[in-house]
């Protein structure tokens, strides 16, 4: 197997093609990684969630990493790493951006069901707070493995 760096264009093409990645955040020197659905746009990634550990971590330490990949087998894959800064789109000045994020994310079937359904199963509160946020990309790189 050979591993090579890929172009910025190839990284962006992967992020436009897939909708699930792994979001890494950290608090008190403890990393935390979770799968997330996302929508890519040049310069940023939009994500929807409910309140929980990842949101609390990112509110205190906004530096995050998103990893996304396409794996055919152990020697044929493409992986992209995005590092950036968390920006919550909850304040009134972000209303247009939040609506834009929602439109992008709505393109994916059932984009909102999983986090809400899971949270509602564990509580009687049907008014679970949802959070739209953006990762402003600081850096992006990718690797491809070929047989």
Which sequence ranges carry the predicted segments?
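Extreme N-terminal tail/first-helix region
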Residues: 1-17
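Short beta-strand segments
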Residues: 18-50, 66-67
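Short, structured patches in soluble enzyme cores that scaffold and shape functional sites
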Residues: 27, 68-70, 136-139
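Surface loops and adjacent helix of pleckstrin homology
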Residues: 50, 69, 145-147
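Short, solvent-exposed aromatic-acidic interface loops
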Residues: 50-53, 105
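Helix-adjacent hinge/juxtasegments
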Residues: 53-81, 87
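Charged, gly/pro-rich active-site loop segments
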Residues: 75-147
């Amino acid at each position: 197997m050979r591993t090579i760096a890929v172009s910025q264009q190839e990284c962006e093409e992967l992020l436009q093609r897939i909708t699930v990645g792994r979001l890494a955040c950290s608090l008190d020197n403890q990393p935390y990684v979770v799968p997330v659905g996302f929508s890519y746009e040049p310069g940023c990634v939009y994500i929807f969630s409910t309140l929980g550990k990842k949101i609390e971590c990112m509110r205190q330490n906004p530096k995050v990493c998103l990893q996304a990949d396409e794996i055919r087998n152990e020697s044929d894959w493409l992986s992209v790493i995005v590092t950036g800064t968390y920006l919550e789109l909850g304040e009134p000045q972000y209303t247009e951006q939040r609506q834009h994020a929602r439109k992008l994310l709505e393109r994916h079937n059932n984009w909102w069901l999983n986090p809400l359904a899971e949270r509602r199963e564990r509580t009687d509160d049907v008014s679970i707070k949802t959070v739209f946020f953006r990762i402003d990309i600081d850096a992006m790189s990718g690797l491809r493995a070929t047989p």
